[in-house]
Amino acid sequence: MMWWAVWCAAMVAGSVFTAAAPPTDSIDLMQMDPSLADDESLGFAMQSLSGRYAAAPWLYLLADVSHDPQRMAEFSQSSGRARPKRKMPSLSINNPMEVLRQRLLLEVARKQMREANQRQAVANRLFLQNVGKRGAWGEPASYLYNN
């Protein structure tokens, strides 16, 4: 258990000496000037934080983002919907009908196979009754030989 505390202390000590992450160009956010804050109540907070985060220009505070409802409406219209539509269960009968069709086709195929097997069994029985006999193939053996 002691190793966990030592590891945490080492991570904290190591993170103190690491440099801040470099700014990335992949984010399309405008960096706003803290002196131009829309809300007057945020002005005092921004000036006190500006010295603390001056070395990390990649850090954007949520207090800097404007809360303009017109801009939010434009954003929601440009994206298509204001909120995503929930996926409701479908009441379609297509899937159950397809399952019934498949089961019916399987049942018909089984019936045809059963009938084909029965026809083959009858043909095999006739062949075995007439093997080695001189009579006609279609006539039973008892008719040819009356002993």
UniProtKB/Swiss-Prot annotation:
One Pfam entry name: CRF
PROSITE patterns the record matches: CRF
Proregion residues excised on maturation: 27-84, 135-147
Highest taxon in the source lineage: Eukaryota
Keyword Transferase attached: no
Keywords: Amidation, Cleavage on pair of basic residues, Hormone, Secreted, Signal
Modified residues (Valine amide): V131
GO aspect biological process, one term: body fluid secretion
Function recorded in the entry: Regulation of fluid secretion.
Name of the protein described by the UniProt record: Diuretic hormone 45
